[in-house]
Amino acid sequence: MGCVFCKKLEPAPKEDVGLEGDFRSQGAEERYYPDPTQGRSSSISPQPISPAFLNVGNIRSVSGTGVTIFVALYDYEARTGDDLTFTKGEKFHILNNTEYDWWEARSLSSGRTGYVPSNYVAPVDSIQAEEWYFGKISRKDAERQLLSDGNPQGAFLIRESETTKGAYSLSIRDWDQNRGDHIKHYKIRKLDMGGYYITTRAQFESVQDLVRHYMEVNDGLCYLLTAPCMVMKPQTLGLAKDAWEIDRNSIALDRRLGTGCFGDVWLGTWNCSTKVAVKTLKPGTMSPKAFLEEAQIMKLLRHDKLVQLYAVVSEEPIYIVTEFMCYGSLLDFLKDRKGHNLMLPNLVDMAAQVAEGMAYMERMNYIHRDLRAANILVGEHLICKIADFGLARLIVDDEYNPQQGTKFPIKWTAPEAALFGRFTVKSDVWSFGILLTELITKGRVPYPGMNNREVLEQVEHGYHMPCPPGCPVSLYEVMEQTWRLDPEERPTFEYLQSFLEDYFTSTEPQYQPGDQT
């Protein structure tokens, strides 16, 4: 998992423009231009994320209007004596929903009372309770999930529209001989007087009615709706209610996964119930007080592309408890047989996921300081999440020093950060460019044949690594943009996310007309 540490956060919706089809390539360089860097404030005010229906206004309306019957979306096994064990489809009376992550509920079947993870339940008979409803996910994530193994032609999901408030988008997996598996998207528009439609000749009172219709007949869609997109059970938001600073004895260290400069990484079990990753730090690595202060901020940063920080043991030796990612670090994964065989579209998509997580951190005004493949973790379906953000600045080891320390990641660090300690989002952008070379070269060490001192001297004078073998020129040009000596001339992560997500997008419109045959 690399030399530094882990946790999790949330991104900015990207706007759907026009109409869209599938993954095929138009030269990305023809559609993007140098990014006009925007000025940014320095304050950070991260907000905890919750299911789509859990906006503060909606939470109030749930209790205020008496709509307190919820249904379980997944099975859940209690982790503490205060939790409820429940099965998918079980119904609850919500007793207290004043906290975002865990709600007090009473099971209507067993009569028992306890806490349930708020992202595992939804209002009964609501659209959020439907298996095919994926809420506020992006078009790109919809494509990733539908193209996962196990989804047949006609697999579908419905998500919130990224451009029209109160409207939805229908995403369908399709196939043809020319393009193979690909995704088509349709706008579900809302009528002024109520009701929904894709094409005006077929209007429905509810989205549920619309789905039932198109599961019986394709009626102009690319394919009949066959089955909801397969979904992985989500991580709970935290281990349990009030499980933040935990007892060391509640963690069992089961298997060492790796050893870094400042400690070990373990596969562990919390409270005899939950698989977790545990980073154990060597005593003296950082001040427990400073770590706990930073961790309080880190736990608020939540996004699908950031490893979620679950809990901490704040006395030395410090334990950092996070979600477990089955394939470990991106660096190790790239060097392994499975990662080494990845093709360019996979690599670009992984880069886009990292850029998405970093774009969220950019919006939150939070700096990673140690962005590299060793600090990106890989899970099922090639999902990538950023780990170890923010903790590098807390390290007090003399060897973690850009001038003479052997542990400092010089080859990934922007010159203004290495020479003058000026760490900003723009220095993270520089590091991201180096990470792109790691992806393209399947884990090769940057600046091959050069030591740290040589790298620092050469980079200060404008040296760039040459284009890696097999790297498209358009992608290398983006790398070079991230390595501009003037930090303000480097692109934003928002721009990098857009560029990479659309790198293989076809020239077809983003949304298909409803009467397409």
From Swiss-Prot:
UniProt main location, coarse: membrane
Modified positions (Phosphotyrosine) in chain numbering: 32, 196, 400, 511
Residue ranges with Basic and acidic residues bias: 17-33
- One Pfam family matching this protein: PK_Tyr_Ser-Thr
Annotated membrane topology: Lipid-anchor; Peripheral membrane protein
Task: Fill in the subunit field for this protein.
Answer: Interacts with ITGB1, ITGB2, MS4A2/FCER1B and FCGR2. Interacts (via SH2 domain) with SYK (tyrosine phosphorylated). Interacts (via SH2 domain) with FLT3 (tyrosine phosphorylated). Interacts with PTK2/FAK1. Interacts (via SH2 domain) with HCLS1 (tyrosine phosphorylated by SYK). Interacts with SIRPA and PTPNS1. Interacts (not phosphorylated on tyrosine residues) with CBL; FGR tyrosine phosphorylation promotes dissociation. Interacts with CLNK.
Q: Know the name of this protein?
A: Tyrosine-protein kinase Fgr
Q: Which gene encodes it?
A: Fgr
